[in-house]
């Protein structure tokens, strides 16, 4: 049993714990959570979730721990990652989900505390490697890669269909837009923020802002370095987002051939990572979907032989958290 610690018990940290419990109950175990809020608050927010409803299992508090279905998870509250006693808790892999410690040097503090590996749940800088499950996860090498970024939820949505299309037809260049649900890095009401657009009320505006998802493609699909760019539109929905990208192909194709290539990729190479949806659905229909990317077939088409538009849905909280759990499991299998 590989032992996990979670640093930062916010939206992603809590969903990662649920994903581990649901997907890997016999191979992964979360044994400690480090968060500055008290154990009672964290247990309450874990059990009662506005987006996903009440947790079906048993959640109780016991001194400095909370018990989930009888399993004790130590509650820690250290502000400095270097002070967290991961070694005392026997933690093998730390899930760094605060959104604060997103560089290699910052995340390496967890290694100093006794952990063997760190997975950053965000785009990172100076990390050992960025991995997207289904795309480049096989590049992981246990002796070389200790600080691993799971990229962003948007990169995890964008990369699978891009990989399938690039392998089939070759991509010359592309532009993407993610229509993204609001997150905690926005303001509920107008309030100062270093990004003046994110300073505006999240529930009342469509907010254009940056995304590193397109540029991060080059980290997981090196062939596309410098060939993709894009931006984000934050919208007043609580979860589930959608990527819309246009790309110029190197070879000609048809709408039906493009759709079939994506269907085949979802059934074979990217099974469980990418799916194709034939129905006429809307965002809330994908809430709780564990796929990284769900291609909307009706809105995926070709213009004049070599310009393609692809639309793909993703639950930016749950789908991404499932990939974090998958990555931890994969790393454990390949060696720490």
Label the predicted regions.
Residues 98-99, 153, 209, 250, ...:
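Structured loop/turn residues at secondary-structure junctions
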Residues 77-80, 224, 290-297:
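A general structural signal for short secondary-structure boundary/capping elements
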Residues 230, 242-336:
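C-terminal active-site/capping subdomain that shapes the small-molecule cofactor and substrate pocket
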Residues 66, 131-133, 147, 189, ...:
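Short clusters of hydrophobic/aromatic residues that line enzyme substrate/ligand-binding pockets
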Residues 50-51, 64, 71, 89, ...:
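Short capping/connector residues at structural and topological boundaries
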Residues 3, 7, 11-16, 25-26, ...:
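Active-site-lining helix/loop region of Rossmann-like oxidoreductase modules
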